[in-house]
Design a protein with these regions (language model features):
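Conserved ABC ATPase "signature" region
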Residues: 109, 128, 132-155
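Conserved ABC ATPase signature
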Residues: 159-163
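Conserved catalytic motifs of ABC-family nucleotide-binding domains
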Residues: 180
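Catalytic Walker B motif of ABC-type/P-loop ATPase nucleotide-binding domains
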Residues: 184-188
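Helical segment within the ABC ATPase nucleotide-binding domain
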Residues: 199-212
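ABC ATPase "signature
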Residues: 244-245
């Protein structure tokens, strides 16, 4: 049974100045797949990310939500090691990213619709190329299993540039799972896909969270999708986490008719939400 949580997270600067990762109860004795503690990223004196703390547990799918400019992409880029935090700590499967970058990132992978694979290579060539980069053992068997999981075996020898958007997304997800990551980051993975294809991919991603020993951090602007897929959501605005909880319960807790209405309120009136949390 999926855990349901409806707690609110106080933004930094309030009574609880950022919830420490150690304060977050673990689902089991193992460390969370992602632990972010008081993370800050500053550009020119402005905090794009302002002291956020959260965790992603095993088998959990967490939605990172917020309007454009809220700090979502900056947060993901810090977790991926693309950006260096101004302050704070990131641990992936218990490994501190700053202290042991290679070992931490070896447990991670990423997929997004805006990051397609080289179109001049076939599906098989792409998966072999990235599999070698990731030093995947028994690579051919791993590729065969992922081609079957995402129903793309018939495209094995097709160049990725000739595939449809949905087919390319399936290949990107297969690539992201080659190294069996403990932490999978998905940035708008079903954007621009037709409803049937998006539904099938959501089901496949949900199965990954259930069947593996990892967790998933998912960003999306599709609130229907988030409500259907995510166990927990974090609402980010102006670099701060304003709300956290079960996406099916949060709207009623804050007098909103839907998750979409609550999203709009957070985007337009973050100070009002912040005051309500007080």
């Amino acid at each position: 049974m999926r855990e349901r949580r409806g707690t609110l997270r106080a933004p930094p600067g309030l009574a609880r100045k950022g919830l420490a990762v150690n304060d977050i109860p673990a689902a089991d004795a193992a460390p969370p797949v992602l632990a972010v503690e008081r993370l800050v990223k500053t550009y020119g004196g402005t905090n794009a990310v302002d002291g956020i703390s959260f965790a992603v547990r095993r088998h959990e799918l967490v939605g990172l939500l917020g309007p454009n400019g809220a700090g979502k992409t900056t947060t993901i880029n810090m977790v991926l090691g693309v950006l260096e935090p101004t302050a704070g700590a990131i641990a992936i499967d218990g490994v501190d990213l700053a202290r042991d970058r290679a070992r931490a990132l070896a447990r991670t992978n990423f997929a997004a619709v805006y990051a397609p694979l080289p179109g001049n290579l076939t599906v098989l060539q792409n998966l072999r190329f990235f599999g070698r980069i990731y030093s995947v053992e028994r690579l051919e068997a791993r590729i065969d299993a992922l081609l079957e999981r995402f129903d793309i075996g018939r495209f094995r020898h097709t160049k990725c540039g000739l595939l449809s958007s949905g087919e390319q997304t399936r290949v990107c997800l297969a690539k992201a799972l080659l190294n069996e990551p403990t932490l999978l980051l998905l940035d708008e993975p079903t954007a621009s896909l037709d409803p049937a294809t998006a539904r099938d991919l959501r089901e496949a991603i949900r199965a990954v969270a259930r069947e593996t020993n990892g967790g998933i951090l998912w960003t999306s602007h599709n609130m229907y999708e988030v409500e259907e897929v995510c166990d927990r959501v974090l609402f980010l605005s102006q670099g701060r986490i304003l709300l956290e909880g079960d996406p099916r319960e949060l709207p009623a807790q804050h007098g909103a008719a839907s998750l979409e209405e609550l999203f709009i309120r957070v985007a337009r009136e973050p100070l009002g939400i912040e005051g309500a949390v007080r």
